[in-house]
Swiss-Prot record:
GO terms for cellular component: viral portal complex; viral procapsid. Residues 463-503 are annotated as: Disordered. Belongs to the SPP1-like portal protein family. The gene is 6. Forms the portal vertex of the capsid. This portal plays critical roles in head assembly, genome packaging, neck/tail attachment, and genome ejection. The portal protein multimerizes as a single ring-shaped homododecamer arranged around a central channel. Binds to the terminase subunits to form the packaging machine. Necessary to ensure correct procapsid size during capsid assembly. Once the capsid is packaged with the DNA, the terminase complex is substituted by the connector proteins gp15. Residues 475-489 have a biased composition (Acidic residues). Homododecamer. Has been seen as 13-mer and 14-mer multimer in experiments, but assembles as homododecamer in vivo. Interacts with the gp7 protein. Interacts with the connector proteins gp15; this interaction occurs at the end of the packaging when the terminase complex is replaced by the connector. This is Portal protein. InterPro entries: Portal_protein_SPP1_Gp6-like (IPR021145), Portal_SPP1-type (IPR006428). It is found in: Virion. NCBIfam families: portal_SPP1 (TIGR01538). GO terms for biological process: symbiont genome ejection through host cell envelope, long flexible tail mechanism; viral DNA genome packaging, headful.
Amino acid sequence: MADIYPLGKTHTEELNEIIVESAKEIAEPDTTMIQKLIDEHNPEPLLKGVRYYMCENDIEKKRRTYYDAAGQQLVDDTKTNNRTSHAWHKLFVDQKTQYLVGEPVTFTSDNKTLLEYVNELADDDFDDILNETVKNMSNKGIEYWHPFVDEEGEFDYVIFPAEEMIVVYKDNTRRDILFALRYYSYKGIMGEETQKAELYTDTHVYYYEKIDGVYQMDYSYGENNPRPHMTKGGQAIGWGRVPIIPFKNNEEMVSDLKFYKDLIDNYDSITSSTMDSFSDFQQIVYVLKNYDGENPKEFTANLRYHSVIKVSGDGGVDTLRAEIPVDSAAKELERIQDELYKSAQAVDNSPETIGGGATGPALENLYALLDLKANMAERKIRAGLRLFFWFFAEYLRNTGKGDFNPDKELTMTFTRTRIQNDSEIVQSLVQGVTGGIMSKETAVARNPFVQDPEEELARIEEEMNQYAEMQGNLLDDEGGDDDLEEDDPNAGAAESGGAGQVS
C-alpha cells in the first residue's frame, strides 16, 4: 500500500517519538524535547472564546485616526472613541450549557451496586464541574479532566484547562492518547512564580520544575518522581491508558465563537460608531459670512470662553448640524441580530419571539437549531463520561469493590432545560407507557418533575405495595360481610376484628 503521508514525519512527530522513547518504564524523559514542545505550543486560539465570553471583544482595539497634511495616518486621541463589547457569545454559551446540563445528568442501571457507587460519585460537585466543562469546551473547543487516586486512596478528578495541555494521540483518528504534557505557572505563598510541567503516560506521571531556564525533575516530590497512577500493597499500578479525558466541543475541536465572531464584531462596530457620532455631532459647525475679523482660532476661543463673536458689515453666522443615520443603523443591527441567532444555533426567547404560542409544535420549531447544536455536543460529552466511568470502574476493580462494565451496565439520561409545556410532556409519557412503547423506567427518567429517577421508582413501588395491601384488606372486609349474613353476628364481628389485627 502506498504511503498516504509521502512527506514523512513532521517536526512535532519527531519530538513526540523522542519523548516517548525516553519515557519507557521509569527512565527520565528528554526535558529538552519537552521544552521544544512547549515553545511550539500556541494557546491563543483557545483563549479567544474565553475573551469574548468575558466581554473582552476585539472592539477594544478600536482606534480613531486621521490623516495629516503629509497623508500619514495618525491616531486621534482627541476624538470620542466608544468601544462597546456586547456579550452575545456569553449569552449563547450559557444558553447551550444550561440547555444541556442545567439539570443534573441522571444515571440508571440494573446493577444496584454499581448505581450506588455512581450516584455517590455524581454529587453536586460533579454537576458543577460538568457545567464548567461544557462552558469551557464551548469557549475553547475542548477541555480535559484528569482522574486520579488521592493520598487517602480515594478516586477523584479535576479539570485541566485546555490552554495548559499538549495532548499527543497515537494516530490521526485522535482516539487513543499517546502521552499528555501539562505546563503552567505556579505562585508560591511569597508571590514568587515558578514554571511547572507534568508528563502523563499510561503508567506514570513525571513532575518538572523550570530552574535557570531549563526543565528539571521536581525534587520536591522526593523519590516519588515519577509517580505511579496508584499503588496496591506497595506495588505500583498503572491505569493502562493515559489518565487524561478530552471533552470535545465538536470533532474539529473549535470554539462556538468561530461561527459567529465576525457578526459580533460588526454589531460592536456599528454600535460604537453610532455612539461616536452622537458625541461628535453634538458640536455645531459654524459658517462665517463676510468674516474678516479674528482668525479661526481667535473666533473659537471667543465663542468657547466668552460666548461672543464679532462680525463686520453685513456679516453673519449660520450653523450646521449633521444628521445621524440612526434608522439605518437600527435596521442593520436588527439584521445582524437575526443572523447571530441563526449562526449560533441559539434560541431567541424574547416575548416578541415566543408570544403566546408556547405549545408543543411551536416550541419544537423554536428549539430546532439549538437541538442540532446540543445533539452534537451531547455525543461528545457522553464519550468523555464513558471514558471517565471506565477509569472509575478500574478503580473499583483494583480496590476490590467489584468488577463492573459501565459501557453496558450504566445508562446516562440528559434532560434538556427548555421552555416547555410540562402537562403535554407528562401526558405524552403516560401514553407511551400505557401504549406499551415506553418502559416505566424511561418515562420516570424523562419526567420534568422528577429529580431522582431511582428514588421516584422506589416511591412508586412503595405506593403500589401500599395500594395492593389496602386492596387486600378491602377484599378481606368484603369477605367478612358475607360471613355476617350467614353466621352469627357476634362471631362475624369477632372474626372481622381478628382479621384487622392480623393485617
